[in-house]
Each structure stands twice: as structure tokens, then as C-alpha cells.
């Protein structure tokens, strides 16, 4: 099983080295920031997306969804597509359809299943998907993806603590917008530091931790790597287009 990151930057990240958040694992797209569709095509994974999990409605996590849906129309998709999201996505999609932003309503071509709610659950391919509300400046859902063989937890954006009582995951994909020296700023803006992400992975008994949603303050990336590995050695600061074996 492979985990591929298409965007690993925070919404404030300047430049193209780290694009807006998105990652792919076995048919599931985790968030859909700007640029995700092109990178899915580059990796020959666009046609393998069966479900999209949107953590929250800040534009860096959802702005690429309209490009994705447009491409499903252009390519004549016939297979169902499931989108899981917190409340609020359906009126955005309706407005986009009213404006003909995707050329035509995708649901005219295929079954578009929108599973929207405060704690939605879904089954997508082999995955059992459970949403877990996490603390951010807007309503944010973390997602636990489970099969009989593995559990993956993806946080979206959150301030510490991220781990819900009793939650367990083999692999944790955790945001780390700030280094520890900016912990107060992280809390103010609803984000996490590297050490906080490491603590969440420890609490979830994770085997491996991936950090994403990296900020671009001077020195942040090097500090984040040092700080997370000091607390949780089997950690990786994900890179755009990075592919990792699970």
C-alpha cells in the first residue's frame, strides 16, 4: 500500500514547492487543494479516485475540488464518486453548478454521493471511514480510515490535542504548520507544532508519523524535522509528490 502526497504546504505557503494540501491512498483522496487534479493525472491516479474526504472548508483544502469535478465531466466518468465533508459543502457545490463552473452538473453523468454531517461515516472500497471532530478555527473533521489490515488517521488542520480518547492508528498523517518556538501562534490560528504531532502519534500508538501542512516561516522545515524525530523517531516530513510505502 502506498501513500502519495500531492500538496504538503500550509495555506500561507508562498511559492510552488509545497502546494495546497492533498494526499492519496488506495482510492481515497485526502483533501483536494489547488493543483491536486494535475498531480493526480501526472501520477496516473486520477481514474483511481473513488472517494474524497474533505476535512474543512478553508479554501486551501477544498479549492481543487471544482477542478477535479470538471475533469470528471470532461472525461465522462461513469463510476460513482463519494465525497465526505463537514456541513456546508452542499451549498457551495450547488452554487458552483448554478454558475456552470464544472460545465455541467457531474451528477448528470454519474452517481455523486455527498456524505455531509458533523460526524459522517462511509464505506469506500475497502475502507471504513469514520470522521472525528478536531479543534480548529472552523469545524474540522479528522478521518480514521480502517481496513482489516491497517488504520490511517488524517487530521486536516487542528490545534493540540488531536488524539481522541481511545483512538488508535497504525499511520498518522498530522499537520505541523509551526515549529515549537511558535507554539503560541500555532494555538492562536488553530494549528499544531511538530512536538504536538509527535505526542498525538504516541497517544495513538502509531507505527509511523507523516507531517504535512508545513509552514514557510524561516527555519521551520529544519526545526520541524529535528523536533518531531526527537520525540517520535519514525517520522517523515512529507514532500510534494512524495510516495511512501505503508
Short names for language-model regions:
Residues 160-245:
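Cap/insert and terminal regions of metallo-dependent hydrolase folds
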Residues 1-153, 159-161, 223-246:
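Binuclear metal-dependent hydrolase catalytic cores
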Amino acid at each position: 500500500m502506498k501513500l502519495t502526497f500531492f500538496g504538503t504546504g500550509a495555506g500561507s505557503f508562498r511559492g510552488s514547492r509545497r502546494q495546497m494540501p492533498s494526499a492519496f491512498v488506495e482510492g481515497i483522496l485526502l483533501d483536494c487543494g489547488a493543483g491536486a487534479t494535475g498531480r493526480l493525472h501526472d501520477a496516473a491516479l486520477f481514474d483511481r479516485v473513488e472517494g474524497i474526504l474533505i476535512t474543512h472548508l478553508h479554501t486551501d483544502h477544498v479549492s481543487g475540488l471544482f477542478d477535479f469535478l470538471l475533469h470528471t465531466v470532461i472525461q465522462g466518468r461513469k463510476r460513482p464518486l463519494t465525497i465526505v465533508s463537514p456541513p456546508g459543502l452542499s451549498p457551495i457545490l450547488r452554487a458552483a453548478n448554478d454558475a456552470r463552473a464544472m460545465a455541467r452538473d457531474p451528477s448528470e453523468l454519474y452517481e455523486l454521493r455527498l456524505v455531509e454531517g458533523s460526524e459522517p461515516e462511509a464505506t469506500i472500497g475497502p475502507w471504513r471511514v469514520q470522521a472525528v471532530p478536531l479543534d480548529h478555527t472552523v469545524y474540522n473533521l479528522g478521518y480514521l480510515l480502517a481496513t482489516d489490515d491497517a488504520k490511517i488517521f488524517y487530521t486536516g488542520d487542528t490545534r493540540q490535542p488531536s488524539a481522541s480518547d481511545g483512538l488508535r492508528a497504525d499511520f498518522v498523517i498530522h499537520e505541523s504548520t509551526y515549529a515549537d518556538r511558535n507554539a503560541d501562534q500555532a494555538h492562536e490560528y488553530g494549528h499544531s507544532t511538530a512536538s504536538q504531532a509527535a505526542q498525538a502519534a504516541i497517544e495513538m500508538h502509531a507505527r509511523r508519523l507523516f507531517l504535512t501542512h508545513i509552514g514557510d516561516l524561516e527555519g521551520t522545515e529544519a526545526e520541524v524535522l529535528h523536533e518531531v524525530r526527537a520525540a517520535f523517531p519514525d517520522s517523515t516530513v512529507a514532500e510534494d509528490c512524495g510516495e511512501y510505502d505503508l
